[in-house]
UniProtKB/Swiss-Prot annotation:
InterPro entries registered for this protein in UniProt: Dxylulose-5-P_synthase, THDP-binding, Transketo_C/PFOR_II, Transketolase-like_Pyr-bd, Transketolase_BS, Transketolase_C, Transketolase_CS
Cofactor remark: Binds 1 Mg(2+) ion per subunit.
GO annotations of cellular component type: cytosol
GO biological process: 1-deoxy-D-xylulose 5-phosphate biosynthetic process; isopentenyl diphosphate biosynthetic process, methylerythritol 4-phosphate pathway; terpenoid biosynthetic process; thiamine biosynthetic process
Cofactor (UniProt): Mg(2+); thiamine diphosphate
The EC number(s) this enzyme carries: 2.2.1.7
Family of this protein: Belongs to the transketolase family. DXPS subfamily.
Catalytic activity of the protein: D-glyceraldehyde 3-phosphate + pyruvate + H(+) = 1-deoxy-D-xylulose 5-phosphate + CO2
Organism field: Geobacter sulfurreducens (strain ATCC 51573 / DSM 12127 / PCA)
Protein name, entry field: 1-deoxy-D-xylulose-5-phosphate synthase 1
HAMAP family: DXP_synth (MF_00315)
Subunit relationships: Homodimer.
Gene that encodes the chain: dxs1
Length: 637
């Protein structure tokens, strides 16, 4: 049986559907989202909440001529379905499939790549300015969630947009704030009617007449404007946006399609920047997601009937969970330890800490720059702040790490979760640059554990260290090894030798250490004897251990789940060069100079050649070429 959704291959097809049938289309899309995401995993709650909003935008605007910029982008599933990607939607976030985020290389309807938060208004304003410079007339719409509005860049963009007065529509998708029904209903009515073309033309005519009345006309006009502003401020929460120079419409019921269509059609005709404030419900239409939207923010495969995860068995505890438990253990012994996160208490494993130590836990919102400098302030006053943040998001606070932490040598701990490849979220979320961008900062100590037990000891080391220190660990389950109950400090800058051999030294860091050890066993079966070193520290390196291995073998393989440029392997090369050991052959294994796409972590590691099989094969091939002439300190990638 054909459905409304079956008739849509592009936004033009959507516009052929009668308005009174759009609510039925919304329900079909929700059913499709549940069916596919329950099998593939993905971001569910946020997408269920913006179905009507996405339909209304594509119904009232003309993509791709009109530009849509989706902040963060994980809520763009309906947008993708309506723009010709329904037949490939079952591949979203899968290896070789379509992205879970907007991607310009994927569709002309994806106007701007997103993945990190709070960028949409800045990008949209840039597009609006480009339109003005070209003499164009297309519309630009930035869709941003209330959570992303906690990011400073969003307000920086609002400030300039209000100053420039260019046509830009900002849709504030508010799924958290509670507005009482009466005020919300009346305000929706006022916003729809007072922004209609008839009212605005009438308003202009009245203003013109008042200005021409001798003596008192201008005074009456000023009084009328004050009255209008006071009324709107009383009726709506839009005073901030209006103070920044925006027209404000809302709040609007975000699941009422007739209302959304009317408002967006009115907004199209406004001159200057405008904010359309839309109230939505995360998880709309699926009770488990509405009840617990956080649990259905990012999900794996699940049973639609029960909402319970399927296809996975309980395994080893995650690195994230062990980090959170260990930090709480340390905090019981040291009242100076405080925890900071940027809107990710669940994702960084700090919910338990927050419950046990609510006065020592700080969720600063999506404000990574503030999180780092806030931590610096706490450290300056004698506390031991632990800033738990995804590796990819710390990039947003680089200047604060330099200026506010390292320059003052303050004891801030950076707990970098999701270090390395993260899997299905792809290039915007892989944490593969931290070893490079932190290593060269003076005073920074940088370490990565080989397993979850070493993570615990490294965290103990970090909170005891007098200076900035970063600890990076991967996404996912640990190795399932027993955990030491007594925590100990690891001497700064010390590695450990896990295996000894004279043919080659494999020096690995973090998640690549155990694969390196497994690779050594494979090589041993072929008569190749390898020394395996768990470096533990990227900065400072265990100089003597590495130099001794270089002297012993004359041949070094480095392994890391980080960009090769400026990473761990580069640090080893620099050490050898500084010591004049130009006869040592070096091959670096890691992430080449490209962005890594989405896919299961094991698949990505295999593709990059940093799993056990890849390390063994690269080592064997490198040794086979050992007799051939090679430049000193060969930087083979």
């Amino acid at each position: 049986m054909s459905t409304l959704l079956d008739t849509i291959t592009c936004p033009a097809d959507l516009k052929k559907i009668p308005r009174d049938q759009l609510p039925a289309l919304a329900e079909e899309i929700r059913a499709f989202l549940l069916e596919t995401v329950s099998r593939t995993g993905g971001h569910l709650a946020s997408n269920l909440g913006v179905v009507e909003l996405s339909i209304a935008l594509h119904y009232c605007f003309d993509s791709p001529t009109d530009r849509f910029v989706w902040d963060v982008g994980h809520q763009a599933y309906t947008h993708k379905i309506l723009t010709g990607r329904r037949d490939r939607f079952h591949t979203q976030r899968q290896y070789g499939g379509i992205s879970g985020f907007p991607k310009r290389s994927e569709s002309s309807h994806d106007a701007f790549d997103t993945g990190h938060s709070s960028t949409s208004i800045s990008a949209g304003l840039g597009m609006a300015m480009a339109r003005e410079l070209r003499g164009g007339s297309n519309k630009v719409v930035a869709v941003i969630g209330d959570g992303s509005m906690t990011g400073g860049i969003a307000f920086e963009a609002l400030n300039q947009a209000g100053h420039l007065k260019k046509n830009l529509i900002v849709v504030l998708n508010d799924n958290e704030m509670s507005i009482s029904p009466n005020v919300g209903a009346f305000s929706s009515f006022v916003s729809r009617k007072l922004t209609g073309s008839y009212f605005r033309e009438l308003k202009k005519e009245v203003q013109g007449l008042l200005q021409n009345i001798p003596a008192i006309g201008k005074d009456i006009l000023q009084f009328a404007r004050r009255a209008e502003n006071s009324l709107k401020g009383f009726l709506t929460p839009g005073m901030l946006f209006e103070a920044l120079g925006f027209d404000y419409i809302g709040p609007i019921q975000g699941h009422n399609l007739p209302q959304l269509l009317e408002v967006f059609e009115n907004a199209r005709g406004l001159d200057g920047p405008v904010v359309v404030h839309v109230m939505t419900t995360k998880g709309k239409g699926y009770v488990p997601a509405e009840t617990n939207p956080s649990a259905f923010h990012g999900v794996g495969p699940f049973d639609v009937a029960t909402g319970k995860t399927t296809g996975s068995k309980p395994g080893a505890a995650s690195y994230t969970g062990i980090f959170g438990d260990t930090l709480a253990q340390l905090a019981r012994e040291n009242e100076k330890i405080v925890a900071i996160t940027a809107a990710m208490p669940d994702g960084t494993g700090l919910t338990g800490f927050a419950k046990e130590f609510p006065e020592r836990f700080f969720d600063v919102g999506i404000a990574e720059q503030h999180a780092v400098t806030f931590a610096a302030g706490l450290a300056a006053e004698g506390f031991r702040p632990v800033t738990a943040i995804y590796s990819t998001f710390l990039q947003r606070a680089y200047d604060q790490v330099f200026h506010d932490v390292c320059l003052q040598n303050l004891p801030v701990v950076f707990a970098l979760d999701r270090g390395g490849v993260v899997g299905d979220d792809g290039p915007t979320h892989h944490g593969v640059f931290d070893l490079s961008y932190l290593r060269h900062l003076p005073g920074m100590t940088l370490m990565a554990p080989k397993d979850e037990n070493e993570l615990r000891h490294m965290l103990k080391t970090a909170v005891s260290h007098d200076g900035p220190i970063a600890l990076r660990y991967p996404r996912g389950a640990g190795c399932g090894i027993p955990l030491d109950q007594e925590l100990r400090e690891i001497p700064i800058g010390t590695g450990e030798i896990l295996a000894e051999g004279d043919d080659v030294a494999i020096i690995a860091i973090g998640i690549t250490v155990l694969p390196a050890l497994e690779a050594a066993r494979t090589l041993a079966e072929k008569g190749i004897r390898a020394t395996v070193i768990n470096a533990r520290f990227v900065k400072p390196l265990d100089r003597e251990m590495i130099l001794q291995a270089a002297r012993r073998t004359g041949c070094i393989i480095t392994a890391e789940e980080n960009a090769l440029q400026g990473g761990f392997g580069s640090a080893v090369l620099e050490l050898l060069a500084d010591e004049g050991m130009t006869g040592v052959r070096v091959k670096r294994l890691g992430i080449p100079d490209r962005f890594v796409e989405q896919g299961p972590q094991p698949q990505l590691r295999a593709d990059l050649g940093i799993d056990a099989a890849g390390i063994a094969a690269a080592t064997e091939a490198f040794l086979a070429a050992k007799g051939a002439p090679a430049p000193a300190l060969s930087m083979v990638k």
